[in-house]
């Protein structure tokens, strides 16, 4: 028996982004406006359903990269992502490889979508970068460039599940590559779009290809039904959310941050030693000074996060009497 529609769960104006117009999409694809402007696409809008699916998939992979596809359509210079699905692929800590099984899965998935009258096409792919930020590696640039040659319009989305948990906000980036023959952008520094540094073992790969792609603005949207469902989930799980201790939830990432920071401090110390021996001042010494300032800033950020986590555990323990302070494995907060 089919239930009657609930007016409170549907808002035509708010839910307009879910109304796919296949003819309008085909018209945009056939006109190919991006061929005249390699930065034609400016924004990616991702539905809450697609966002949750991608973040949960990325988080489930742990230290291994995962990969999936995104469905949606084009609206002017905006790429609208309405849904996403994971792929059965083999991932490592540095790359993810799509095999024949994944290609067969994509074909079958799209066939089933058509049967259910879900006509949105695949317009992008996503994968995870656990702990090292949102950017495209050399392999990612090659994959995205190939897709843009044969499957336009296409966008690459990268999610960092570790930084997502650490910062309590989704760490996500959307990118498109620069076509061959177009003058590339100037190479960027060793920080991601949010200002966080790329780990030392990834800096070379990051710097070697950062001029071959550009970032799009990422926005998200949700339907009336999504809002109701998320409100229901919050009312059900707010206790678990409040009881979580970020120091324990993401301690592996914090440890890796400290190890990487130690390696970079050691490298900076050697550079400073060499400059002290030669006594030279100039652009090289200025770069070393800037690097040391950046390292000090990161040390302060990590220390601040640790202090806030310990303070949160202390407050929970006093308010709820749950012994949250002891959950931090005997780590005591600093006394002022």
From Swiss-Prot:
Domain of life: Eukaryota
Domain MPN: residue ranges: 44-181
MF terms (GO), sorted A to Z: deNEDDylase activity; metal ion binding; metallopeptidase activity
Gene3D superfamilies registered for this protein in UniProt: Cytidine Deaminase, domain 2
Assigned EC number: 3.4.-.-
SMART domains recorded: JAB_MPN (SM00232)
Class of this enzyme: hydrolase
Motif window: JAMM motif: 127-140
GO cellular component annotations of the record: COP9 signalosome; cytoplasm
GO BP of this protein: protein deneddylation; proteolysis; regulation of cell cycle
Localization annotation: Cytoplasm; Nucleus
Major location category of this protein: cytoplasm
Binding site for Zn(2+): 127, 129, 140
Binding partners and assembly: Component of the COP9 signalosome (CSN) complex.
Family: Belongs to the peptidase M67A family. CSN5 subfamily.
PANTHER family in UniProt: EUKARYOTIC TRANSLATION INITIATION FACTOR 3 -RELATED
Known role: Catalytic component of the COP9 signalosome (CSN) complex that acts as an regulator of the ubiquitin (Ubl) conjugation pathway by mediating the deneddylation of the cullin subunit of SCF-type E3 ubiquitin-protein ligase complexes. The CSN complex is involved in the regulation of the circadian clock through its control of the stability of the SCF(FWD-1) complex.
Protein name, per record: COP9 signalosome complex subunit 5
Annotated source species: Neurospora crassa (strain ATCC 24698 / 74-OR23-1A / CBS 708.71 / DSM 1257 / FGSC 987)
Gene: csn-5
């Amino acid at each position: 028996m089919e239930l009657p529609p609930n007016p409170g769960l549907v808002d035509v104006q708010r839910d307009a982004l879910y109304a796919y117009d296949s003819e309008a999409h085909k018209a945009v694809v056939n006109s190919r406006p991006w061929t005249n402007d390699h930065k034609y696409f400016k924004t990616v809008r991702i539905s809450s359903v697609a966002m949750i699916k991608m973040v949960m998939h990325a988080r489930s992979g742990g230290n291994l990269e995962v990969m999936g596809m995104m469905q949606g359509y084009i609206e002017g210079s905006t790429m609208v992502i309405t849904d996403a699905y994971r792929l059965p692929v083999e991932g490592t800590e540095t790359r993810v490889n799509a095999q024949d099984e994944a290609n067969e899965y994509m074909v079958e998935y799209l066939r089933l979508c058509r049967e259910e009258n879900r006509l949105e096409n695949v317009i992008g792919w996503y994968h995870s970068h656990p702990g090292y930020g949102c950017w495209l590696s050399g392999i990612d640039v090659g994959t995205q460039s190939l897709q843009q040659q044969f499957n336009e319009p296409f966008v690459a989305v990268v999610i960092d599940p570790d930084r997502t948990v650490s910062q309590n906000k989704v760490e996500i980036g959307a990118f498109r590559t620069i076509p061959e023959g177009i003058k590339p952008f100037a190479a960027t520094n060793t920080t991601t779009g949010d200002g966080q540094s790329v780990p030392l073992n990834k800096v070379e790969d990051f710097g070697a290809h950062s001029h071959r792609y550009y970032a799009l603005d990422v926005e998200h949207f949700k339907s009336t039904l999504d809002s109701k469902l998320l409100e229901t989930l919050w009312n059900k799980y707010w206790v678990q959310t409040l009881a979580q201790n970020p120091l324990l939830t993401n301690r592996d990432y914090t440890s890796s941050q400290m190890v990487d920071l130690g390696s970079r401090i050691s490298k900076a110390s050697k550079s400073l030693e060499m400059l002290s021996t030669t006594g030279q001042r100039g652009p090289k010494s200025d770069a070393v000074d800037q690097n040391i300032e950046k390292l000090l800033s990161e040390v302060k950020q990590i220390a601040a996060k640790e202090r806030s986590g310990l303070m949160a555990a202390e407050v929970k323990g006093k308010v709820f009497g749950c012994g949250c302070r002891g959950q931090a494995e005997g780590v005591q907060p600093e006394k002022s």
